[in-house]
């Protein structure tokens, strides 16, 4: 069964876009506003339209065998704090809904992902620092 699962928006998003709720997808950042997990939040990991539940990263429940499993939360108990507008159709929908209330929405700047070269350089620098610390510890041990 397919069902659009709309989640209410936070107050600042309501003011920014002029809408009260919007369908939730993977990548949105949400927080729990009621229930036993109230106050917790994170990025949406899975949206299960068949059962009508949303799984959020970092919110888990222990299974009988001791492993952790994603905890399904009903969408009416969630609130979107950050929308993932990387998909163009989603941004167009927000833009058209905001236009009804005479609100102009600008396309957000995409967050740049770190390049592999930069992360490799940072990793090498970290390894060098660890190697220097080890040699200092070895030198101190030899002197004592």
UniProtKB/Swiss-Prot annotation:
Biased composition (Basic and acidic residues): 103-134
Keyword RNA-binding: yes
Entry keyword set: Ribonucleoprotein, Ribosomal protein, RNA-binding, rRNA-binding
InterPro entries in the cross-refs: KOW, Rib_uL2_dom2, Ribosomal_uL24_CS, Ribosomal_uL24_euk/arc, Ribosomal_uL24_KOW, Translation_prot_SH3-like_sf
Location of region: Disordered: 102-144
Domain of life, source organism: Archaea
Acidic residues: compositionally biased ranges: 135-144
Example of a GO biological process term: translation
Gene Ontology cellular-component annotations: large ribosomal subunit
PANTHER family tied to this protein: 60S RIBOSOMAL PROTEIN L26 FAMILY MEMBER
Annotated function: One of two assembly initiator proteins, it binds directly to the 5'-end of the 23S rRNA, where it nucleates assembly of the 50S subunit.
Annotated family: Belongs to the universal ribosomal protein uL24 family.
Subunit comment: Part of the 50S ribosomal subunit.
Name recorded for this polypeptide: Large ribosomal subunit protein uL24
Species this protein is from: Thermoplasma acidophilum (strain ATCC 25905 / DSM 1728 / JCM 9062 / NBRC 15155 / AMRC-C165)
